[in-house]
């Protein structure tokens, strides 16, 4: 070994030059600056003084102090998130400079310029990628100014995805320019790392210790002892020496075949230059090493390494070779053989070998009485020459049983090669008697023959490992000496230079393996040194004297076909042209060695054609036997309860028929039946008799050999399993057409079978009194029932019910004669409902709130308070959070502003605060009543639902005596908000679609339904959308049906105006000021038993014979769901009616609730707003809409889903309320409860206008005419010119009033409609002089 270099480990202190000292000192300072810069970047706080802001009132939070805060702010502003990489780049540059400080190479300025270009490309593209794909950091752009410029430039041109791809390409080019690395090299490095990781992982999972011999450790110890004195030997030399030693030992193993027998595993136990070794199965057929039929496990394992998958020297055909060695030794007299290589015999021992790990399960096949020839046991000694004794048959043997298919398959072109062999005669010489039995039981793929005495199993045969083995005495036999074959030494084959040569030679030899070469039948001749498998053609099958079973007629054909096929295919297993080796290699282990020919597994059809049965065929045979045993049954299996029920049903029917014959046709088994049922029963009886006749006819005409599953001539094939040659039932059977019953939609088809053939119940259309269900007619009793053979006719009329009723079973309820679906709403349904006993609906109809309430997280609120202070400090606003009020939806933070800070500054920053706090919306409350703080309302992370039941079940609602009490929801503190509609007195509701406006209106209606009786409160509901308020149709509180027509809505409002005038007259007569005082007077008169007569009644006003008396007047609530649609459709007339009601209707007990989703000034005019002070604003789209409703902003910042601002009466500050949620099921439940209490008593004439002319807009001319109308008519008829401007100038009135007068003239027919030029014609004649 050459002398190795030994590194000196001693370190000496050497002085640096002046330039080197200065350079290293400078590098140390730069590294310290990079560390300081990283600390400043990581501890950046927006509230610190920096380049982007100057006002600050807090101590500096940055670890770098004020310079660090300034520098960090500047870097973040320029580079964004890429600023964090700047300290890392600085440290990397210092390391590079320190490593290359001693190199005095020539400076390539072109390379330096390319590196500079690459650095610039990397910086720009990194910032651009961060700006496009990363989130912003603090209040800086994620890519800084550079990334913002690039992203704004690329996005209009390439979009975000295209810009990202373009920047990635430029970044890759910049990396190549800066580093000089090729992307091919980078890809190779990445691939190498991945492969190293996968290799390491796979090596860790594989048992590598099995590949190392025990001798290696000893050899390593020897090497260590030898080289113990070499203390300074390098690690590389030791690894190289170990590798050379392993290679040397591996080569020695290949040279020495007795060491580890590696060639036995790689080349099927043979060398390339050896003669062919012939291995036999237990039946004398040569075993293919790659044959899956004969590649079973060994009975015994050699003393080799059991964990070595490659070098254990055990071929897969060793069990077959051992069996063949013993078999050929005893069958030397059977037939002439050819010389082959001698195989060492297996020594006999007293104790039989253990059972193999894989036990083969024999497949039961058709039994036959023909004896077949079994191979001789292995322990029998060989006989000289060919002196064959007389064959003695003690017991007839059975046909070979095919092993179970899933374990293996035959590995030849012809699937079934199962020849018959002559049985071995009884020998007086005792050998290894147990070997024959063990060979037959253990190696089931080669030979599984048993006598009839042993084969005492039914059709479902037990596995082989469960069968009892015959116990025989085992005579002691001296083991024969093992003869080891001395093979010539040769160089090892496991060298890579011989692979191509071996592969070419092996391809030629393997191609000649499976060439079918017919062998002539040879005469017996003297035995040579080895054995040969006997020819199948030389041993014909012998007829047995035993009785042939009834199944032999069908099996015989398959048996003869199998024997013939085996005779033809016998050369497939012959050993002609088998002089070359048969290598057995493992794929993926070692080099690419010659591979054997792929084996084609026979198909199911090929196996079945030669009589080889599969597990599915055995199951089919089993089913066929069961079908033959149960050929007179219905073919379907039922449980005991179903069979008992059907038997009881049939007995009941027979009993009813007997009683009818005895007592007449009127007897119905103690159950009265109407005439229609009697006719249906008669038709059913005729259908049953007809079915029974057809069944007898088909069962009598069944031919003798029509049974397709008879086992007499059974020959199974995969195609026959799908066919059925037996008679089938007809597809269309004539059925007696029943009488159509008008009240029953469809009755199930009743099929009457014989008593011994019960039918299953059908779950689809089963009736309670009829447990049986349709069954295919004309069922063949001897034919097995299959699901595809049961045909039903959905297009034919259905048979009626049975002719009798069973008393113990309830009768099916008849459906109601209606065409309405049960899921459709029945408005005005007359079905009787159960009347509740309580005066008002129960709260159980509403959804209860959850019992567990999520606690308030005070720690999270404290964190949010600190964050609010920090965000306000970012906008140069000094404020402290002094308190917070958590609610179900939002949390209000009370801010104590610094002196001199205006609340308007925070209000203008509401959207910026929402963005910086990452919330949906922020509402600023400039004035909190009773507190000197400013409120900041933020939404909660987990929003809670406000249930209507928990608001109604409150003392504020229960203790309020007003029948017009309504609940709105909860405020921000979680307290319920209850209002009185009588004090409002009118309500205006506005909100966009989906804001919860309709849900809020439903909550108000339900709260009044839970508070008032129909005699206290009545409703007039106007629903132009025909969706929201139509669900209340039919409740007793309605004065009229829900109004959906716009003209009817105008008439309803006019009726309200007339009712208001009538009530004012009555109140003035009684001397009261409001409806409550009027009702008190009426109640007092009732207590005095002196009712008050109507003072304004005249005898011609009504048909009453007596003078009517005054009664209690209820409150009237007019609800308009979509006020804007009503205004746009009918026009300004509705505005006048609403304005009159809003002005005067409060004292008369008439209240308006107007809801709209378009809060514009042309819908909510100043006249309406002036008379409706109470308003509720849900989420609106803009501040303008918020000011239209509330006269102030704030509604645009609501969260939606019931979040509202409630401006109560006599108050200018709105209260934020979270509306109660009402489900549709709750609304329907309350409505149904009130419908069950009584019907509504509608008032006639509310939606009709009998005094107006058609199409006149529904105006009452006597009451709605202008005071100047008569004078204007006289003026127009005299001048014969109708114009708005003329009337305006003549009477000196406004334009709107003049236009109204002209429209009234048009309505009265005085003037015509406006023409295309704007002129009108005067239709009335001129006045008389």
Curated annotation (Swiss-Prot):
Location of the protein in the cell: Cell inner membrane
Gene Ontology terms: cellular component: cell division site; divisome complex; membrane; plasma membrane
One Pfam family here: FtsK_4TM
Sequence segments annotated as region (Alpha): 818-943
Binding site for ATP: 994-999
Cytoplasmic side: 1-24, 99-115, 180-1329
Effect seen on changing residue 138 to C: Impairs the ability of FtsK to function in cell division. Uncouples invagination of the inner and outer membranes and results in cellular voids
Region (Gamma): 1259-1329
Membrane topology, record value: Multi-pass membrane protein
Extent of Polar residues compositional bias: 437-448, 690-699
The keyword Magnesium is assigned to this record: no
Effect of residue 135 to C: Impairs the ability of FtsK to function in cell division. Uncouples invagination of the inner and outer membranes and results in cellular voids
One BP term from GO: septum digestion after cytokinesis
Keyword ATP-binding: yes
NCBIfam families (UniProt xref): PRK10263.1
Quaternary organization: Homohexamer. Forms a ring that surrounds DNA. Interacts with FtsZ, FtsQ, FtsL and FtsI.
Membership in a protein family: Belongs to the FtsK/SpoIIIE/SftA family.
Function text: Essential cell division protein that coordinates cell division and chromosome segregation. The N-terminus is involved in assembly of the cell-division machinery. The C-terminus functions as a DNA motor that moves dsDNA in an ATP-dependent manner towards the dif recombination site, which is located within the replication terminus region. Translocation stops specifically at Xer-dif sites, where FtsK interacts with the Xer recombinase, allowing activation of chromosome unlinking by recombination. FtsK orienting polar sequences (KOPS) guide the direction of DNA translocation.
Record-given protein name: DNA translocase FtsK
Species of the source: Escherichia coli (strain K12)
């Amino acid at each position: 070994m050459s002398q190795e270099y030994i590194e000196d480990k001693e370190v000496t202190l050497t002085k640096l030059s002046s330039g080197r000292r200065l350079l290293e000192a400078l590098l140390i300072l730069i590294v310290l600056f990079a560390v300081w810069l990283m600390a400043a970047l990581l501890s950046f706080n927006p509230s610190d003084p920096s380049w982007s802001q100057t006002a600050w009132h807090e101590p500096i939070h940055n670890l770098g102090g004020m310079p660090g805060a300034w520098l960090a702010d500047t870097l973040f502003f320029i580079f964004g998130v890429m600023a964090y990489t700047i300290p890392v780049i600085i440290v990397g540059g210092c390391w590079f400079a320190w490593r290359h400080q001693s190199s005095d190479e020539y400076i390539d300025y072109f390379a330096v310029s390319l590196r500079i270009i690459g650095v610039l490309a990397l910086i720009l593209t990194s910032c651009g990628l961060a700006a496009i794909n990363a989130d912003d950091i603090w209040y800086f752009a994620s890519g800084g100014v550079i990334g913002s410029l690039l992203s704004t430039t690329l996005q209009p041109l390439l979009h975000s995805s295209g810009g990202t791809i373009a920047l990635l390409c430029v970044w890759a080019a910049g990396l190549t320019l800066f580093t000089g690395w090729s992307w091919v090299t980078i890809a190779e490095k990445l691939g190498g790392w991945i492969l190293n990781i996968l290799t390491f992982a796979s090596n860790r999972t594989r048992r590598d210790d099995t590949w190392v011999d025990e001798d290696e450790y000893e050899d390593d110890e020897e090497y260590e002892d030898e080289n113990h004195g070499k203390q300074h030997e390098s690690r590389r030399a030791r690894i190289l020496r170990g590798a050379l030693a392993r290679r040397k030992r591996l080569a020695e193993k290949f040279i020495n075949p007795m060491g580890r027998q590696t060639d036995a595993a790689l080349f099927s136990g043979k060398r390339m230059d050896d003669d062919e070794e012939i291995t036999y199965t237990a039946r004398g057929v040569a075993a293919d090493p790659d044959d899956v039929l004969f590649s079973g496990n060994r009975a015994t394992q050699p003393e080799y390494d059991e964990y070595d998958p490659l070098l254990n020297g055990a071929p897969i055909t060793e069990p077959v070779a051992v069996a063949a060695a013993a078999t050929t030794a005893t069958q030397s007299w059977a037939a002439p053989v050819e010389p082959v290589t001698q195989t060492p015999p297996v020594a006999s021992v007293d104790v039989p070998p253990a059972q193999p790990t894989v036990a083969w399960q024999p497949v039961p096949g058709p039994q036959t009485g023909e004896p077949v020839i079994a191979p001789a046991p292995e322990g029998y000694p060989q006989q000289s020459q060919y002196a064959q004794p007389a064959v003695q048959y003690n017991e007839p043997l059975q046909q070979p049983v095919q092993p179970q298919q899933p374990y293996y398959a035959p590995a030849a072109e012809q699937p079934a090669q199962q020849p018959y062999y002559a049985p071995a005669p009884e020998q007086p010489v005792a050998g290894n008697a147990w070997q024959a039995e063990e060979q037959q039981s253990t190696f089931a793929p080669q030979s599984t023959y048993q006598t009839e005495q042993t084969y005492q199993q039914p059709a479902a045969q037990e596995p082989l490992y469960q069968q009892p083995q015959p116990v025989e005495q085992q005579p002691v036999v001296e083991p024969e000496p093992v003869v080891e074959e001395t093979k010539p030494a040769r160089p090892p084959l496991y060298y890579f230079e011989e692979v191509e040569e071996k592969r070419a030679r092996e391809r030629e030899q393997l191609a000649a393996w499976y060439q079918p070469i017919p062998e002539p039948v040879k005469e017996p001749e003297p035995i040579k040194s080895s054995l040969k498998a006997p020819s199948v053609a030389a041993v014909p099958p012998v007829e047995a004297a035993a009785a042939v079973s009834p199944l032999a007629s069908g099996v015989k054909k398959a048996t003869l076909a199998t024997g013939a096929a085996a005779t033809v295919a016998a050369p497939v297993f012959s050993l002609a042209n088998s002089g070359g080796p048969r290598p057995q290699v493992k794929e993926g282990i070692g080099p690419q060695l010659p591979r054997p020919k792929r084996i084609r597994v026979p198909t199911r059809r090929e196996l079945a054609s030669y009589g080889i049965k599969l597990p599915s065929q055995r199951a089919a045979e089993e089913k066929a036997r069961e079908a033959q045993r149960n050929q007179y049954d219905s073919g379907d299996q039922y449980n005991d309860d179903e069979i008992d029920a059907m038997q009881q049903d049939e007995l009941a029917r027979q009993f009813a028929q007997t009683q009818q014959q005895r007592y007449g046709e009127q007897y119905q088994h103690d159950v009265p039946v109407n005439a229609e049922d009697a006719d249906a029963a008669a038709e059913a009886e005729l259908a049953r008799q007809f079915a029974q006749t057809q069944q007898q006819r088909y069962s009598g005409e069944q031919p003798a050999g029509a049974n397709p599953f008879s086992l007499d001539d059974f020959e199974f094939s995969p195609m026959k399993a799908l066919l059925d040659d037996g008679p089938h039932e007809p597809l269309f059977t004539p059925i007696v057409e029943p009488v159509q019953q008008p009240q029953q939609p469809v009755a199930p088809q009743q099929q009457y079978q014989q008593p011994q053939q019960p039918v299953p119940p059908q779950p689809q259309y089963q009736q309670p009194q009829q447990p049986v269900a349709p069954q295919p007619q004309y069922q063949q009793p001897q034919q097995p029932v299959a699901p595809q053979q049961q045909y039903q006719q959905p297009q034919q009329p259905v048979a009626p019910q049975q002719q009798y009723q069973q008393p113990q079973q309830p009768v099916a309820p008849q459906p109601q004669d209606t065409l309405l679906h049960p899921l459709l709403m029945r408005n005005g349904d007359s079905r009787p409902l159960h009347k509740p006993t309580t005066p008002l609906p129960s709260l159980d109809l509403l959804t209860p709130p959850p019992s567990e309430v999520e606690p308030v997280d005070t720690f999270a609120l404290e964190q949010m308070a600190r964050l609010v202070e920090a965000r306000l400090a970012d906008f140069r606003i000094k404020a402290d959070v002094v308190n917070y009020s958590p609610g179900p939806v939002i949390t209000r933070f009370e801010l104590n502003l610094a002196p001199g800070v205006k609340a308007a500054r925070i209000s203008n920053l509401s959207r910026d605060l929402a963005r910086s706090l990452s919330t949906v919306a922020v509402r600023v409350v400039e004035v909190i009543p009773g507190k000197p703080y400013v409120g900041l309302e933020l939404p909660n992370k987990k929003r809670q639902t406000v249930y209507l039941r928990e608001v109604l079940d409150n003392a504020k609602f229960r203790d309020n005596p007003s029948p017009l009490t309504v609940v709105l929801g909860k405020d921000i503190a979680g307290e319920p908000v209850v209002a009185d509609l009588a004090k409002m007195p009118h309500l205006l509701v506005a909100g966009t679609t989906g804001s919860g406006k309709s849900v809020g209106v439903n909550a108000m209606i339900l709260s009044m339904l839970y508070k008032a009786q129909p005699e206290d409160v009545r409703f007039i509901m106007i629903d132009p959308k025909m969706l929201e308020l139509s669900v209340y149709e039919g409740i007793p509180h309605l004065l009229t049906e829900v109004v959906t027509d716009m003209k009817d809505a105008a008439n309803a409002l006019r009726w309200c105006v007339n009712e208001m005038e009538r009530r004012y007259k009555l109140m003035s007569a009684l001397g009261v000021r409001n409806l409550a005082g009027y009702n008190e007077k009426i109640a007092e008169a009732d207590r005095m038993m002196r009712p008050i007569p109507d003072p304004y009644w005249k005898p011609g006003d009504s048909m009453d014979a007596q003078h009517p008396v005054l009664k209690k007047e209820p409150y009237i609530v007019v609800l308009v769901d979509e006020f804007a649609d009503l205004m746009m459709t009918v026009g300004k007339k509705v505005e006048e009616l609403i304005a009159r009601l809003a002005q005067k209707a409060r004292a008369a007990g008439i209240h308006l609730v107007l809801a709209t989703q378009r809060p514009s000034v042309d819908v909510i005019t100043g006249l309406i707003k002036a008379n409706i002070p109470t308003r509720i604003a849900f989420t609106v789209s803009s501040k303008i809409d918020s000011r239209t409703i509330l006269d102030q902003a704030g509604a645009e910042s609501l969260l939606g889903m019931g979040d509202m601002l409630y401006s109560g009466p006599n108050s200018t500050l709105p209260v934020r309320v979270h509306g109660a949620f009402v489900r549709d099921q709750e609304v329907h439940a309350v409505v149904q409860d009130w419908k069950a209490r009584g019907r509504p008593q509608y008032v006639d004439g509310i939606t009709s206008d009998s005094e107006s002319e058609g199409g006149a807009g529904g105006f009452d001319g006597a009451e709605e005419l202008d005071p100047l109308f008569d004078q204007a008519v006289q003026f127009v008829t005299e001048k014969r010119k109708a114009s708005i401007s003329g009337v305006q100038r003549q009477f000196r009135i406004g334009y709107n009033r003049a236009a109204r007068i002209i429209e009234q003239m048009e309505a009265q027919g005085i003037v015509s409609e406006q023409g295309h030029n704007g002129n009108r014609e005067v239709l009335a004649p001129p006045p008389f002089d």
